[in-house]
Amino acid sequence: MRRGLALESLIHGAGHENGIRAGTENTPYIVGLGQAAHLAANGLDESAVGMARLRDRLEKQLCEAIPGLKVNGGSVDRLPNTLSVSFPKVAARDILARLPELCASTGSACHSTGQVESATLAAMGKGIDHVAGTIRLSCGWYTSQDEVDRVAGLLIDAWENLSG
C-alpha cells in the first residue's frame, strides 16, 4: 500500500490495521480456503482435460446439426471449459429466451448484456449478425456427458424452430 493513500474500510467496526480492517480474521475459513486451493490445484490438469472433452463434444454436436454455425476462436488455444458459437440467422437472445433451464451468455464475456457490439468479437473481424448470434457456454467440474448432450439437443431444437 502506498504511503498516504486513503482507503475506506469495506467493513466498519473495530479499528484493526489503522482502521482499515474490522474484526478478527476467520481462521477456519482461511484454512478451508487453503485446503480448497490445494485440492483444486491437484486435480486441475485432469479436470481441464475432462472439461475440454465435454466442450469438444458439445461443439461437434452443434456443428454437425446446424449448417453455418461458427465457432469463435476454435482454431486457437482457448479455455478448456468454454465454447463460444455463433448461430446463423437467429439472435442468440431469442434462442436463450426459449431455454429458461439453460444458463448461458450472449456475445463475449466483455459484453454479457449483448446490447452493444462486443469489442472482442469485433476485433476478431466478426460482423453484427455474427455477434448477435453468439452464445457462450461453459462446462464445470461436475458437468456430465448427459448434460452436454441435453444442452446440445435443446440448442439445436431451439435454433431449428426459430430458423424456420
Task: Mark where each language-model region is.
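A general structural signal for well-ordered alpha-helical segments in protein cores
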Residues: 27-30, 37, 55, 59, ...
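Glycine- and other small-residue-rich loops at beta-strand/loop junctions that grip anionic moieties
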Residues: 22, 29, 47, 84-85, ...
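Structural signature of PLP-dependent enzymes
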Residues: 37-60, 70-79
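PLP-dependent enzyme catalytic core of the Aspartate aminotransferase-like
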Residues: 29, 118-164
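Conserved core segment of the aminotransferase class I/II
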Residues: 1-44, 48
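Active-site pocket-lining segment
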Residues: 65, 72-82, 95-101
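Conserved C-terminal alpha-helix-loop-beta "cap" of PLP-dependent enzymes
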Residues: 83-135
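Thr-Gly-centered strand-to-loop micro-motif
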Residues: 7, 20, 73-74, 105-108, ...
